[in-house]
Amino acid sequence: MLASASLTQPHDSIASNDSGILYPISSTLSYSKLSTGHRAFAISLSVSKELDSYAKAILDPRWQEAMQAEIDALKANNNWTICPLHPGKVPIRCKWLYKVKLKVDDSVERYKARLVAKGFTQTERIDFYETFFPVVKFVTVRTLLALAAVSGWHLTQLDVNNAFLHSDLHEEVFMLPPPRFGNKGEVCRLLKSLYGLKQASRQWFAKLSSTIVNQGFVQSKSNYSAFTRIKGVSIIIILVYVDDILIASNDVDALNSFKQLLDSKFKLKDLGTLKYFLGLEVARTTKSISLCQRKYTLDLLVEIGLLVSKPASIPVKQFAKFSNSIGEPISYISQYRRLIGKLLYLTLTKPDICYLVHKLSQFMSSPKVPHLQAAYIIIKYLKKTPRQGLFLSAYSSL
């Protein structure tokens, strides 16, 4: 956690009191060259806390207030009606999720409690049918950002507040009420979707996409989460990833008009100029757009326990060879798979590790110790270059 606003290296605070650390993260990462606004934003990405249980939350008046606010919002949105359980029906369960959002100076911005359904307790063909929904491809995101850099388009980001709660629910789903908010023998008959339901994402995307298409946008046939509208010289392109919306346009008036329309349909949070989208940190100047995954890299270093390790100068040992027949098998295969998955995500902005990560991904079924050691070397290499990413020049030819 960030101790004070004067600390400009949030992840370095883990080792800040240990003068014996040989390789602190501050030796390879600095925020000093960032603009004041972007530096504050980069630090704010690391300052949030979570509460892990209802038993703790119910003892704190602040969390009680947050939970009551969530219940009131769900009732106002007509998400359910209270009724006796219908014969032959089995209610699903729910749980609370808690998060404290902090400001850059470590003061509390707000306490957020969210009620979610335990979707794993749903029964297929009774509580849900279809669950698939599309999300934008990352190659599309990079392509749009490259176009925006060259064309000088405006980039803005929207977040839909309680997105899933806006969509209608077609199935008959019953849910046990949350603790202390219901009477004995009563259940919640869900009228609208709820976070955690297996069909929640699908229902939300169906409602959002139909709203966008009705405004004259054309949905891409190769990427269903991309929408384009061209009127004369006015261009608006929309990319959707669940409740995160990225918009690029050369027409500010048309862009603002569309945002107002969306806000009238769904309650939006206008995040302003694009800075952070799906783990990608975006910094823009008049000459370029830079993409990196600094926070994701630092979080991975903390998780693996290599934050204070010696950085590697290259991502692989010289003359390294990988084989299924060399080395002892590792017992925690799932952890290896998870680690490689995280590294695959980092290849979005780090092409220098693409070959190695994809090579190591060939051993998912039976990884050996040398494969895990090679993955650790990649992570140590990433410590040396946490801010390195993609540079999209405004002067590139399309």
Predicted regions and their residues:
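Long, low-complexity, charge-biased intrinsically disordered regions
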Residues: M1-L398
